[in-house]
Amino acid sequence: VEFFGAKLLYVVDTHTHADHNSACKLMRERYGVKVVMHRATDAPYIDVRVDDGDEIRFGKQALKVIYTPGHTQDSMCLLFNDRIFTGDTLLIGGCGRTDLPGGSAEQQWDSLRRLQALANEFRVYPGHDYREAVSTLGDEKQKNPRLTIASRDEFIKFMTSRKPPLPRKIQEALEWNRTPIYRQRGLGEGI
């Protein structure tokens, strides 16, 4: 922020994270920004709660909110011109897991189908880049194994049969991300 001389207005979390601590509270304190999340979140420190179809305006630009529950109950994606920021709803070559608190394979199927209805040209920027940092919806529709599953029942069976290990610090992350008060622990701690 300092390097570019940028003025931050908002910090947006696409969902409540169970795998790491969000930096929203730290950024709010340091830069005076408003924290934005979907209205379904149970995080108490949110300044702006958005819903499907809302716009997060900055200058003459806006991010359009698409509510995409499934990975979590408060998951959302953000459309900006020819880009879509998918959080953990859609990953490159995969999608967010649905076995963590608030996850639903049924809702994830519905949310992914909603994203599939968008134009192939949208560039996809996921919350995690396990493979690459950017893709297109067209490539994901063709190559992403989660998007090529033909039926809802088959998708739900696949997602509910997967039992990856829980995130190592799930309890710590959920507590941090659902606690209203930022507790000063020293610069960088808690992120």
Feature map (PLM): residue ranges:
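Catalytic core of the metallo-beta-lactamase
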Residues: 1-8, 45-126
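Active-site HxH/HxHxD metal-binding segment of metal-dependent hydrolases
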Residues: 1-65, 142-143
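Histidine-centered catalytic micro-motifs
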Residues: 11-21, 68-73, 125-132
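Residue-level signal for the nucleotide or nucleotide-sugar donor/cofactor binding architecture
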Residues: 22, 102-103, 150
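Short phosphate-engaging motifs
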Residues: 23, 107, 133
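Short amphipathic alpha-helical segments
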Residues: 23-26, 98, 137-138
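Short secondary-structure transition/capping segments
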Residues: 32, 58-64, 86, 90, ...
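Accessory terminal helices/loops
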Residues: 110-123, 127-191
